[in-house]
Amino acid sequence: MKTLLLLIPLVLTACGTLTGIPAHGGGKRFAVEQELVAASSRAAVKEMDLSALKGRKAALYVSVMGDQGSGNISGGRYSIDALIRGGYHNNPESATQYSYPAYDTTATTKADALSSVTTSTSLLNAPAAALTKNSGRKGERSAGLSVNGTGDYRNETLLANPRDVSFLTNLIQTVFYLRGIEVVPPEYADTDVFVTVDVFGIVRSRTELHLYNAETLKAQTKLEYFAVDRDSRKLLIAPKTAAYESQYQEQYALWMGPYSVGKTVKASDRLMVDFSDITPYGDTTAQNRPDFKQNNGKNPDVGNEVIRRRKGG
């Protein structure tokens, strides 16, 4: 049981995935990033069900979530180095014997018939020899494991690319055209199509285990769309969502490699909140209420010239 408890922090410490702040990167976007953004957006737009708009003239309104911001990542996971590093140091017992030289001093004193002799022995204050003896074993041991955590100091700034919105809008228009739906200016349209792009960006992440490492780059596109008939105010397409993500991943062993590189495109999680369950209030008197039929000539929002153009007059 003790061994298991020791192995758990050893295996789990510094093992995890650190997800960086989504960013387009500085300067030019590199090819893999372009490929992923294009793949996720194409897949999401391709999934849009536009069968209810067959033969109609649609005015397209696309709104994209802003993608500007910045953030800091400071510090990280604790290092296992501070947990198990230790040392053992053993010194044998040591005894030193010093030999100090001795010398005798004799003094004789005579005065008339009296005399005295004084003899003294003194030691020098510096040893003439020293003998050191050690008993026992001498040993030194140390053990430790150092793992660099995934939390470095980082500062990333997201740079918005205004051409991304134009690219996505052109993709939507292309799909409309290929489906046989004509996209026209608002004054010539009989249908309004609203597309709200909630998610349109990338996510970078790094997985660091003791033996396995991976670099992952994902691009996600999530959108919601609906269509309204201008004459009847009827919902031709109730709010629907389309969400796809593309991924590029490099896998390493002890950060050697990559031994595997993969690309995937798959359906992503839907929006956390969508408008598919919203219905009009039962007592509403608004003229633009969905499914409320009215005469265009009595609609103050539509001019006579607009009606004439719709009818081809």
From Swiss-Prot:
Its main location: membrane. GO terms for cellular component: cell outer membrane. It is a lipid-anchor. A lipid is attached at residue 15 (N-palmitoyl cysteine). PROSITE patterns: PROKAR_LIPOPROTEIN. The keyword S-adenosyl-L-methionine does not apply. The keyword Translocase does not apply. Residues 282-298 have a biased composition (Polar residues). It is found in: Cell outer membrane. Residues 1-14 form the signal peptide. Residues 282-313 are annotated as: Disordered. A lipid is attached at residue 15 (S-diacylglycerol cysteine). GO terms for biological process: cell adhesion. Keywords: Cell adhesion, Cell outer membrane, Lipoprotein, Membrane, Palmitate, Signal, Virulence. Belongs to the MafA family. This is Adhesin MafA 1/2. It comes from Neisseria meningitidis serogroup C (strain 053442). The gene is mafA1.
